[in-house]
Amino acid sequence: MTDNFADADVALVRSAAMHDLDLPESLLAIARAGAGVNNIPLDKCADKGVVVFNTPGANANGVKELVLCGMLLASRDIIGGNKWVANNTDNENISKDMEKAKKNFAGNEIKGKKLGVIGLGAIGRLVANAAESMGMEVYGNDPFISVEGALSLKRDVHLVKTREEIFKECDFITVHTPLVDDTKKMINKETIAMMKDGVVVLNFARDLLVDDEAMCEALASGKVKKYVTDFPNPNVAGVEGVIA
């Protein structure tokens, strides 16, 4: 947060937490550079008459690309192969040795795999459509999807009524929901137990959608193959199987 916030008329915020801040009397509005507003004290703003607005969809394509990249990184050990090359820069026989070592970085195609998309807002719909174009069998769940949103999905994207159907059926699960009471830690010990062995979970939406402790246990046991997230924190950073 900038030093001159105390005199601000308007604040532009990305990820900084504002709940513990004293809102200046001069403040008229807060603009969130993104869709979620969970880092903004909405009740306090309402009491003071501060207008809050967001920018849903502004970064949707960029996040979609990150999710697709995350699925590919989780399917093929590209990171491991890159580290192997970096550790063998002085090896005169690197080309020959790589032929022997590359089997350690083998992976699987995502074509034909089942992807579950939980939350079909601007980002979720783009992910679903792009994954379907890449040959994945896509399932989506969103009880609040609009008619316009549903019509923007490709015809082969399967809409399901519950998250549980996705937890049980899909090889990849990506979450794209806001953080509310119903979604907080929705990826937890109980829901992970429903999932296929070796599932890949992706979270580019909100940090607290996933129970870190349950996820780390699932990674250690092999229940979850990879956890790909845009929210590294002390609980998951450096844990085997985490791509962050």
Role assignments for model-derived ranges:
Residues 113, 120-121:
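Glycine-rich Rossmann-fold phosphate-binding loop(s) that bind the pyrophosphate
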Residues 1-53, 188:
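An N-terminal-biased, well-structured beta-alpha scaffold segment characteristic
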Residues 16-22, 143-241:
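Rossmann-like adenosine-cofactor binding region
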Residues 27, 111-114, 189, 198:
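Phosphate-coordination loops involved in phosphoryl transfer and adenosine-cofactor binding
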Residues 130-131, 195:
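Aromatic pocket-lining residues of Rossmann-like dinucleotide-binding sites
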Residues 56-114:
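Phosphate-binding beta-alpha-beta segment of Rossmann-like dinucleotide-binding domains, i.e.
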Residues 124-125:
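N-terminal Rossmann-fold NAD(P) dinucleotide-binding loop
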Residues 24-29, 47-51, 136, 197-199, ...:
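A short helix->loop->beta-strand "cap" motif at the edges of active sites that frequently abuts
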